[in-house]
Amino acid sequence: MRGSLALMVPSIAGARMTQNATFESVTTDSRTASAGELFVALRGENFDGHDFLEQVASRGVGAVVVEQLPPGLKLPAIVVPNTLVALGQIANFWRTRFDIPVIGVTGSNGKTTVKEMIASILAAAYGEEGRLATRGNLNNEIGVPLTLMRLTEAHKAAVVELGMNHPGEIGRLTAIAAPAIGLVNNAQREHQEFMHTVEAVAQENGAVIAGLPADGVAVFPADDTYTDLWMGLAQQRGQRKVITFGLTSAANVSCAHRASGAGSELDVTVAGTGKGDGTFTVQLAAFGLHNVRNALAAIACAVAAGVERDAIVRGLESFAPVSGRLQRKQAACGATVIDDTYNANPDSVRAAIDVLAEAAEPRILVLGDMGEVGTQGREFHEEIAAYAASRGITTVLATGELARHMTAAGAQHFEQFDELLAALDAKLGTKSDATVLVKGSRFMKMERVVQHLLGQHNSGKEAH
């Protein structure tokens, strides 16, 4: 993002400029701030960017955005009531300079995977340099603005992931990103500590639909409990275009599917969308029914953006699973490791267990606590243990405070992480053809189990 303070100030509520200046890009990180950049001094729980203004000045930044102007600071500045809000308004100012399809991706599970599928499709259509995509999962009130500020004249389309864990966040991010296409991938049991009900999650994620312009396109499942809710949001301000997806013939984008090699083969049907209608086949290198649905969501968004069919097929067929999301790896002992350690909630764990259940025996589930479950922690962990047993997963190794509730259904619980690793090693031996699914919420750092199995013995022997 390149610009001047004078051009931006009218777009920032309550802003006051000390003097004009131009800048080449925007940063919020004092450690990497460099000459010619605009530094936005954010405040966080454990830091305050205002404490580093002298440091960024010594690095040669061109200007700063601050809430308080310290005495003696000679840098050009914009003074605002709230720098986090200002960051979003600056990003929206920049975003509105580009008349390109921006796709906003929300949902309880699969956001990052669908975003990467869409990014792969857009790269096939416009080239790697012709599309912008969220890096990793930078999907919050800092990550979304920083993503949008990377827009350039070279970009023909963009896909931006919008995340939340509290009410109101999707609406704010939608206002910043101003998407022309809004996807709700699903509504499931995420962030229940703060959201309390799945309906509240559905309503919150639906804010991306409510925030679309009148000519925007709403994309959501045709076969979800909350389909009618999202349809209602799409029609609140006139008849926005709607493209649905799902495993039902009633969906605009649907498919027949079968297991094939390292993933699934999809016979896709697109109907009732206009220009993108037709049938085609996609070889998807990702396991699980939920990834079939993720692919349908990506196709629906691509159709909404006007992407040609050949680019949709090429993009999806070049997609590779995202790190820590059902990635298949080979353990040192020969076992197959399914690395799904990025995060966990009850519905994503059930989906991962479904993938494990398709593998030949022996099968092992290694699970750490699921977080942000509110008062339902015991219930959710008992449910998952029972579900694993119902799918024929008889070896379940669990760790974490809440995971102790899984023992009633036959799981083994370990207080110490090194005890879990020792038990897993004993079950696998030096040579094994087992399949091991490893999953847990981010704070459990279950990737340490994967590192151990792969022979990367830096996993640490921590207690929980």
What name fits each language-model region?
Residues 67-74, 181-336, 361, 386-389, ...:
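Acidic, Mg2+-coordinating active-site environments of NTP-dependent enzymes
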Residues 8, 37, 56, 90, ...:
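Residue-level signal for inorganic ion chemistry
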Residues 87-222, 228-239, 451-464:
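Phosphate-binding loop of NTP-binding sites
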Residues 1-89, 93, 357-360, 386-387, ...:
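N-terminal leader/targeting and accessory segments in enzymes
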Residues 11, 67, 100-106, 132, ...:
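Short beta-strands and strand-loop turn motifs
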Residues 105, 323-327, 443, 447-451, ...:
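ATP-dependent carboxylate/acyl-activation modules
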Residues 44-47, 322-324, 341-413, 441, ...:
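Active-site beta-alpha connecting loops in nucleotide-dependent enzymes
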Residues 421-431:
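Short amphipathic alpha-helix with an adjacent loop that forms part of the alpha/beta core around
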